Regions:
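Bacterial N-terminal signal peptides that target proteins for export
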Residues: 1-7
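Metal-centered catalytic cores of metalloenzymes
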Residues: 7, 12-13, 17-95, 99-171
């Protein structure tokens, strides 16, 4: 009987306090989702001309022209290139982005990954794309800040220093 009286007294006390004998559990809260990292994509263009080379091209390959569209992400550079007007014997071997203002020759900073023999001009023209997936983010940032300080340059067998060149501009 004493046991019954003790249980009854405890139940009355709990009821008087407005509580229940059940233990409350906290409501779980959802963890916040990680913030997605934005993908930076910026597109630049260059009008490629033999006359832009330093020194300018004055032989038969002076007729070569083209356009390059370069699209950057945080760590890559995609080159979309069209070259026209070249003599049938022209062989475009390599291409890249150099640091340098108009009329100033500078160091290669981002390679297009084009290698000798990768492309063949037909009727003096070619269109191709290449992507460098390992471009230096610091160089990409510098190009975005001042595209005029950078140029696209494609080289031929006859002109190892470059046959067509153009400064980058925001597309």
């Amino acid at each position: 009987m004493r046991l019954f009286a003790g249980i009854a007294a405890t139940a009355i006390l709990i009821a008087a306090c407005g509580g229940t004998a059940a233990v409350s559990t906290p409501t779980p809260t959802a963890s916040p989702s990680p913030t997605p990292v934005p993908t930076v994509a910026n597109t630049f263009k260059a009008e490629l001309k033999a006359a832009n080379e330093n020194p300018p091209i004055t032989d038969a390959e002076a007729t070569c022209t083209g356009t390059a569209t370069v699209t950057f992400t945080a760590t890559s550079a995609k080159f979309d290139v069209s070259i026209t007007g070249c003599p049938a014997t022209t062989a475009i071997n390599i291409g890249h982005i150099h640091e340098g203002a108009v009329g100033v020759n500078g160091a290669v900073k981002i390679d297009s990954t084009l290698k000798a023999g990768d492309i063949t001009l037909t009727g003096g023209a070619v269109t191709f794309s290449r992507t460098n997936s390992a471009a230096d983010p610091a160089i990409i940032t510098a190009i975005m800040a001042n595209p005029a300080g950078w140029y696209v340059n494609f080289h031929s067998t006859a002109h190892g220093g470059g046959v067509i060149r153009g400064q980058l501009t925001k597309a």
